[in-house]
């Protein structure tokens, strides 16, 4: 996140770990704009929709500025996605695709959860309904990316598991993955003081996700299913 409070530290760590696959998490909700005049960004999805409708936000200029900031820090992103999946909105998607093409970033996230993300149950009815509704946008989404020469994965998983990501759910998901390339969205981390004070609901769950990703059961499930772990750089 180019407008994130810990950007400088994250960029330093990325430079120290050149094998790390780093993407750009484009932000149009929350925080301050990177592009002049560095105004406050909308605080919610409804506020962003109103800003888009009123043409009060220069989407392309802001997203391009965020990518330029990352490039200036010595990092070339391998992929793009957006905070809160805002590129599901047509004007944002167009801007993201333009930015990807301009800066030679080949991959863009396709955030349409595969139904089996809810393997074993547990996803809220709202998340299941939202995920199902979003899939109706998939055709147009893929056409826009193709028109700009962008690539995306065959499948995506993780939306319905957000906040309830545990070893059991991950093992079930791995065993039910379809053929092709699947991006797994996750939010692993350590619950330190900064995270406790952060404005996010994903706090304790980050340690649960980290535990699931490192679990022996997860490794065994990957082996049993014949799943190969890759990153975007390996797919370029």
Question: Locations of the language-model features?
Answer:
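Terminal accessory/targeting
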Residues: 1-79, 90-236
């Amino acid at each position: 996140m180019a407008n994130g409070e810990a950007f400088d530290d994250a960029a330093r760590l990325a430079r120290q770990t050149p094998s790390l696959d780093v993407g750009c998490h484009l932000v149009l909700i929350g925080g301050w704009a990177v592009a002049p005049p560095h105004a406050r960004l909308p605080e919610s999805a409804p506020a962003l929709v109103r800003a888009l409708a009123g043409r009060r936000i220069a989407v392309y200029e802001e997203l391009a500025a965020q990518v330029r900031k990352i490039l200036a820090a010595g990092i070339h992103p391998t992929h793009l996605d957006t905070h809160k999946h805002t590129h599901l909105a047509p004007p944002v998607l167009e801007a993201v695709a333009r930015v990807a093409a301009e800066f030679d970033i080949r991959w863009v996230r396709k955030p349409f959860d595969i139904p089996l993300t809810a393997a074993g149950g547990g996803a809220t009815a709202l998340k299941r309904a939202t995920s199902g509704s979003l899939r109706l946008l998939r055709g147009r989404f893929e056409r826009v990316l193709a028109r700009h020469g962008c690539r995306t994965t065959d499948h995506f998983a993780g939306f319905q598991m957000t906040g309830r990501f545990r070893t059991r759910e991950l093992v079930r998901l791995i065993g039910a993955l379809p053929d092709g390339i699947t991006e797994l969205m996750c939010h692993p981390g350590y619950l330190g003081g900064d995270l406790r004070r952060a404005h996010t609901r994903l706090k304790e769950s980050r340690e649960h996700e980290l535990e699931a990703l490192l679990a022996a059961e997860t490794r065994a499930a990957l082996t049993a299913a014949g799943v190969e772990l890759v990153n975007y750089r390996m797919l370029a």
